[in-house]
Amino acid sequence: NYPTQDSTMDKTFANNL
């Protein structure tokens, strides 16, 4: 579960992985 404010950042990070 990702926080709303960090969702974009987390998705980008996950995409990098």
From Swiss-Prot:
GO terms for molecular function: lactoperoxidase activity; metal ion binding. It comes from the Eukaryota. Binds 2 calcium ions per subunit. It catalyses: 2 a phenolic donor + H2O2 = 2 a phenolic radical donor + 2 H2O. Its EC number is 1.11.1.7. Its cofactor is Ca(2+); heme b. The keyword Calcium applies. The keyword Kinase does not apply. One of its GO terms (biological process) is hydrogen peroxide catabolic process. Keywords: Calcium, Heme, Hydrogen peroxide, Iron, Metal-binding, Oxidoreductase, Peroxidase. Belongs to the peroxidase family. Classical plant (class III) peroxidase subfamily. Removal of H(2)O(2), oxidation of toxic reductants, biosynthesis and degradation of lignin, suberization, auxin catabolism, response to environmental stresses such as wounding, pathogen attack and oxidative stress. These functions might be dependent on each isozyme/isoform in each plant tissue. This is Peroxidase 7. The lineage of its organism: Eukaryota, Viridiplantae, Streptophyta, Embryophyta, Tracheophyta.
